[in-house]
């Protein structure tokens, strides 16, 4: 199966007074065009659409709906993880992606295990989104409680922190919320063949077995050396 991943759009970001939305939008739509061009089976968003309290948040929400609509029209389902910048910490459990529930083809998974594809050609997906404090969960306990056939393909996608990783602008310049860590040891012990893909970090890299998608644009001056764009995998 062909999978395309895009993450950390931060469509409301401003760098030294310069609104970056147009650049973010261009990068996002490049990932969508690529997904359609290769006839991708699934499109994943790895979290951090925008902060919920900014006056510019509506544009990011509009962009998310546009992406979901275009992908659905091309027959490509999209799965959207909530990131630490998306959550609304008012006790309601809300987030910036909530309205996508009305978009055809768009799914926002809770912490859960599900399958994508057909009964003959499918992958198991384990989603580890960031959640508001009112809906917090223990990622280690969640992984240890799963029963998935290790002979079938498993993808774990999350928007969590990685212990020991070199902090980048997502931590130093754009911090938000609490730290919730990837259960990498638990995943490796229970599902040794699982492929792990993560959002949250803006620099594309692989750390502790997790393939970081990276942001769709260089959001701060410290990200000038980053490779931005989207990630493609075939499983």
Task: Cite the ranges covered by each PLM segment.
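Extreme N-terminal starter segment of soluble prokaryotic enzymes
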Residues: 1-4
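Glycine-rich phosphate-binding loop signature in dinucleotide/nucleotide-binding domains
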Residues: 35-39, 74, 146-152, 232-234
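Core catalytic region of metal-dependent phosphoesterases/phosphodiesterases
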Residues: 9, 13-118, 187-193
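Conserved beta-sheet core of the metallophosphoesterase superfamily
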Residues: 163, 168-234
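Active-site glycine-centered loops adjacent to acidic/histidine catalytic or metal-binding residues
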Residues: 8, 47-48, 83-84, 159, ...
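Binuclear metal-dependent hydrolase catalytic cores centered on His/Asp/Glu-rich metal-binding motifs
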Residues: 119-186
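Short, well-ordered beta-strand micro-motif
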Residues: 115-117, 124, 232-234
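Proline-centered loop/turn at the N-terminus of a beta-strand
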Residues: 42, 77-79, 153-155, 194-195, ...
């Amino acid at each position: 199966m062909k999978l395309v991943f895009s993450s950390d759009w931060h469509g409301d970001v401003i760098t030294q007074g310069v609104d970056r939305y147009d650049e973010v939008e261009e990068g996002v739509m490049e990932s969508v065009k690529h997904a359609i061009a290769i006839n991708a089976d699934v499109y994943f968003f790895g979290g951090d659409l925008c902060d919920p309290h900014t006056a510019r948040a509506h544009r990011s929400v509009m962009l998310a709906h546009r992406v979901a609509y275009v992908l659905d029209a091309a027959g490509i389902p999209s799965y959207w993880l909530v990131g630490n910048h998306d959550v609304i910490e008012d006790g309601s459990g809300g987030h910036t992606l909530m309205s996508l529930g009305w978009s055809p083809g768009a799914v926002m998974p809770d912490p859960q295990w599900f399958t994508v594809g057909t009964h003959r050609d499918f992958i198991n997906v384990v989603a580890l989104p960031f959640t508001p404090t009112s809906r917090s969960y223990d990622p280690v306990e969640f992984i240890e409680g799963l029963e998935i056939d290790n002979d079938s393909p498993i993808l774990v996608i999350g928007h969590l922190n990685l212990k020991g990783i070199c902090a980048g602008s997502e931590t130093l310049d754009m911090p938000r919320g609490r730290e919730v860590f990837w259960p990498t040891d638990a995943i490796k012990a229970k599902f040794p063949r699982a492929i792990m893909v993560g959002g949250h970090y803006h620099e594309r890299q692989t750390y502790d077995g997790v393939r970081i998608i990276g942001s769709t644009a260089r959001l701060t001056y410290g990200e000038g050396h980053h490779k931005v764009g989207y990630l493609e995998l075939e499983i």
